[in-house]
């Protein structure tokens, strides 16, 4: 009897092996708390230090420096602490990269790029990242995670997924719905609407299909529920079973374990 792996089409590019949860933390207090939890549970989830929404206006440099220090700290035992930089239209995105790569590049598992409006936007930031890596003498290329949360990014999601260096496509539900200026109701930002509204479901299908075809990990948006573990688990189950997402964001420690349980094969 031949094993199924010997006769079934194996696909093209294999997926990167990533933890099932990407946990976002915007302040140093929350970053440290997440690191403590990661030490207790093990590297079953990534931590992303948020230098976009987490940084106060005028304090972007200090915030990026703080995030780099957290990444380089002894508390980071598993080297699974990444960072999200500002978007390509923001004045500080290059500075974010220079600080993060210059101070913590050797331990950065990924950098997340928010709000691109095209594949060209993503390419600009990847090219700059590679240039900074060379300037810093880094002997590796840091993987990139790309947020799909604009009309333009969704339109070019297949091109984005195929860009060298892209490791994950992340759906930004809130900004995507907001970008429709009321045409999609607010109820589509939470369950069950986020799985049932045709325009949102279409976006999730496009992102997952492009990612899976290109050997990239599709990451689902956060759930707004923070306390009801069954609700959280069900959101993750629907993302995994109905839409093919292999990873999901969390914004509260309570969300991590239910998502991990739901994302298991």
Identify what each model region corresponds to.
Residues 1-265:
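Expand to "…catalyze enediolate/carbanion chemistry for C-C bond making/breaking, isomerization
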């Amino acid at each position: 009897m031949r094993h199924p792996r010997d006769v079934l089409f194996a696909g093209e590019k294999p997926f990167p092996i990533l933890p099932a949860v990407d946990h976002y933390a915007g302040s140093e207090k929350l970053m440290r708390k997440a690191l403590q939890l990661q030490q207790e549970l093990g590297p079953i989830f990534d931590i992303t230090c948020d230098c976009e929404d987490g940084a106060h206006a005028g304090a972007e440099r200090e915030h990026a420096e703080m995030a780099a220090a957290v990444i380089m700290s002894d508390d980071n035992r598993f080297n699974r602490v990444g960072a999200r930089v500002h978007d390509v239209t923001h004045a500080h995105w290059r500075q974010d990269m220079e600080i993060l790569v210059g101070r913590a590049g050797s331990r950065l598992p990924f950098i997340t790029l928010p709000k691109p409006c095209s594949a060209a936007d993503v390419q600009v930031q990847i090219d700059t990242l590679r240039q900074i890596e060379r300037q810093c003498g880094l002997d590796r290329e840091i993987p990139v995670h790309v947020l799909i949360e604009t009309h333009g990014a969704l339109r070019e999601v297949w091109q984005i997924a195929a860009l060298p260096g892209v490791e994950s496509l992340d759906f930004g539900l809130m900004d995507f719905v907001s970008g429709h200026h009321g045409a999609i109701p607010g109820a589509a930002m939470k369950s069950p609407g986020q799985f049932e509204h045709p325009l949102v479901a279409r976006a999730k299908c496009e992102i997952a299909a492009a990612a899976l075809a290109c050997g990239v990990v599709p990451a689902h948006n956060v759930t707004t529920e923070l306390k009801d573990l069954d609700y959280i688990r069900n959101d993750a189950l629907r993302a995994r079973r109905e839409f093919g997402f292999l990873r999901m964001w969390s914004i509260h420690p309570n969300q991590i374990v239910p998502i991990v349980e739901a994302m298991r094969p």
